[in-house]
A protein has these predicted regions:
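Elongated scaffold/linker segments in the mid-to-C-terminal portions of large proteins
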Residues: 103, 256-416, 472-512
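Membrane-proximal, proline-rich intrinsically disordered regions
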Residues: 24-76, 96-102, 254, 479-512
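Conserved, well-structured interaction surfaces
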Residues: 49, 57-59, 87-163, 178, ...
Length: 512
């Protein structure tokens, strides 16, 4: 088994190098230099394994590169305060067209099209391997095609949230010719992504492989929290629908996930497992099944890195040898967000002492947000080197449960919504609430509290900005934010490098 996993890690490294060179260089930039020569590939099971892991690796890189997942999701008008970095401050202030290198890199969507192209190449060429290598079965091919189809749809959803309209490319461009392409309406792209996910779901399993029928040398729990499974696809579907304001479907999909969570061993995560160095964000955690969709940086697989992790921005002494974090949650924000002293995430313990599950160094000017702190392999005692192995967790059961509460409330099923809100509250030490007694049967008050609970529970997980957008579409209680939505200001500007290379790409109107 260990030999198989070693081969898999080597395959991943090879695939990342190969696919990145083939897929990322000037994709969609009308450049004939992009040509993929694959005459030596797609002959064996090892070839398909390398290519599949490569698509996962490129997806992980797209989210982690320049800390995109947190820059776009948590920092923009979020709860984090910036400590002496003007580029990060520009993001926080929504001044995304400032001439900083970080902003230029984040605004370039090329890395996402590397994922899309690699997935398309796989779907077009992997079927030939079934004919050439008898060890690569039709069932194996179905699983693999379903995964890359889902990853491609996920990439499109992720891009739409950042840029709005994006070019919709449904087949590979590995022949060296890239026509100039217009941006496609965001709703058309999301409809395509939903259709692709529904197609993928037909072949995606809850678990991969069995003891008698291994999937690439492993089975069951060994793949948990690592690969796109049936519930991973449903979770992306649920979020696409919520982003569209289609709460009827969002409720249906989120309900399915909750009802079938045991199929993938997903459970509600205790506060200890959520914040432990070997808990949910640790790649090989005992609770890894609760990562409904995540992307790992396993230290033991030589995947841990210095960049591409929240810890790079948030940790400081005594956890790492760094005087100050680059971003932090101020004391004022902590006390205004966590208003209940019984809250296990940030509340009072031992009469006068605050819980340290989310924050350390509370007595200092800049508290350290330590909810996620996977240093090296999670057991590092020598913290001189800032190398991190935390997984990017896109969604977990708490997120989906609160999303269902949001959907139910939007559908005027408020009493049901409260029951799902209470599932999260009681797991974090808070009392149950009543729609009548605590919210006066006021739906808007309940919606506001559901988003406040998401704010507390998902802090530092890349959700705050997108939650603010959805909240405002429902609540409509902030005129400035509503103008931002109507004017397209909720999206990022498109990189000038992209516009220069493709004359048909126009800048988002708000950023012209």
């Amino acid at each position: 088994m260990k030999n198989n996993m070693k081969k898999l890690r080597l395959a991943l490294f090879s695939a990342l190098v190969c696919l990145f060179l083939q897929s990322c260089n000037d994709f969609l930039d009308v450049d004939p230099k992009h040509a993929a020569s694959e005459t030596q590939q797609w002959k064996t099971l090892e070839d398909t394994r390398s290519a599949l892991m490569g698509v996962y690796g490129l997806t992980r890189a797209a989210l982690a590169d320049n800390n995109t997942h947190w820059i776009c999701g948590d920092l923009r008008k979020g709860d984090f305060t910036v400590y002496k970095r003007s580029d990060l401050q520009a993001v926080s202030d929504n001044e995304l067209n400032k001439p900083y290198d970080l902003l230029k890199k984040v605004s370039n969507w090329r890395r996402f099209y590397a994922v899309i192209n690699a997935a398309s190449v796989f779907m077009e060429k992997a079927p030939r391997t079934v004919e050439l290598d008898r060890s690569y079965s039709e069932q194996n091919l179905k699983y693999d095609i379903a995964q890359v189809r889902a990853l491609r749809a996920f990439a499109y959803f992720y891009m739409v949230r950042i840029w709005g309209d994006v070019p919709l490319v449904t087949y590979s461009y590995d022949n060296g010719t890239f026509p100039s392409m217009l941006r496609t309406d965001a709703q058309t792209v999301l409809s395509y992504a939903k259709a692709e996910l529904l197609t993928a779901i037909e072949d995606l399993p809850y678990q991969y492989g069995t003891q008698t029928n291994l999937y690439y040398g492993s089975y069951g729990a060994q793949w948990q929290g690592k690969l796109f499974n049936k519930l991973s696809a449903y979770s992306v579907l649920a979020h696409i629908c919520a982003w569209q304001g289609n709460y009827a479907e969002a409720e249906t999909y989120s309900a399915f996930i909750i009802d079938h969570a045991s199929e993938i061993n997903a459970k509600y995560t205790s506060i200890a497992d959520l914040t432990s160095e070997t808990g949910l964000f640790y790649s090989n955690a005992s609770v890894k099944g609760s990562r409904i969709l995540g992307f790992n940086f396993a230290h033991n697989d030589n995947e841990a890195t210095q960049s591409g992790h929240l810890e790079q921005l948030t940790l400081a002494y005594p956890l790492v040898q760094k005087s100050y974090p680059e971003i932090y949650i101020s004391k004022d924000s902590l006390f205004s967000i966590f208003t209940n002293f019984d809250d296990l995430r940030f509340g009072i313990i031992d009469t006068i002492k605050y819980s340290s599950y989310y924050v350390q160094n509370l007595n200092e000017e800049t508290p350290v947000f330590s909810k996620i702190k996977i240093i090296q392999d999670g057991s590092a005692k020598d913290n001189d080197f800032g190398v991190f192995g935390s997984s990017i967790v896109f969604t977990r059961l708490e997120d989906i449960t609160l999303l269902r509460a949001e959907a139910l409330c939007a559908l005027n099923r408020s009493t049901e919504a409260v029951s799902y809100l209470n599932m999260i509250r009681t797991n974090r030490g808070l009392r149950e609430v009543s729609f009548k007694k605590d919210f006066g049967n006021n739906r808007e008050s309940l919606i506001a509290e559901i988003f406040e609970e998401r704010r507390r529970e998902l802090m530092g997980e890349g959700w705050r900005w997108y939650d603010l957008v959805r909240r405002q579409k429902l609540m409509k209680d902030n005129e400035a934010f509503l103008r931002l939505i109507s004017s397209g200001g909720i999206y990022w500007p498109v990189s000038e490098d992209i516009i220069t290379a493709n004359s048909q790409i126009e800048q988002n109107e708000f950023w012209k």
